[in-house]
A protein has these predicted regions:
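Hydrophobic cores of alpha-helical transmembrane segments in multi-pass inner/ER membrane proteins
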Residues: 142-155
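Internal alpha-helical transmembrane segments of multi-pass membrane proteins
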Residues: 92-110
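Extracytosolic (periplasmic/ER-lumenal) interhelical loops and adjacent juxtamembrane/interface segments
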Residues: 37, 41-66
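Hydrophobic alpha-helical transmembrane segments
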Residues: 14-19, 68-90, 101-106, ...
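N-terminal signal-anchor transmembrane alpha helix
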Residues: 8-41
Length: 155
């Protein structure tokens, strides 16, 4: 097994997990906000309030900066949660460390599935429009390159 956070002392492992979670979370939210700006011409506040709506429901959309801040906090909690799960899974599935790029790409797809099939349905986020393949493909690519690969490389 390669030298990774798995082989480290607990405090070093925690540091690596947090680093991976914050790097992945930052890349992901930056990509999401950039995509939103390209599509709408609007700033990142709406993206962050959408994330906050998972807990606060529709009132998140009128909550201004405080709700956007909550959205950012919740976003990083999810990113760090995905990182912790990868950290737990990595030593149990030996083929994961044979090719960290492929592993990262696959983990990005997994992150998308968890988000769409578990996190959003269990949240207070308002219902979205019907499934759109193009939007799903963009979301998957963002998660592959901004969540999956960074977590796989850092862990």
């Amino acid at each position: 097994m390669p030298a990774t956070a798995i082989n480290q002392q607990p405090s070093k492992a925690l540091s690596t997990i947090l680093q991976a979670g914050f790097v992945a979370g930052t890349l992901d939210i930056a990509a999401a906000c950039t995509q939103y700006y390209i599509n709408t011409g609007k700033g990142p506040g709406n993206v962050l309030r959408y994330v906050a709506s998972g807990v606060f429901g529709n009132k998140a959309f009128t909550g201004g900066v405080p709700m956007a801040a909550w959205g950012l906090v919740f976003h990083y909690i999810i990113a760090i949660g995905l990182t912790i799960f990868f950290f737990w899974l990595f030593p149990k599935v030996k083929w994961l460390y044979k090719n960290i790029i492929v592993t990262g790409l696959l983990y990005g797809i997994f992150a998308w599935a968890v988000t769409v099939l578990i996190i959003v349905p269990l949240s207070n986020t308002p219902p979205r429009a019907a499934f759109d393949f193009r939007k799903a493909a963009i979301a998957i690519l963002i998660l592959m390159f901004c969540i999956g690969i960074p977590i796989s490389v850092i862990i």
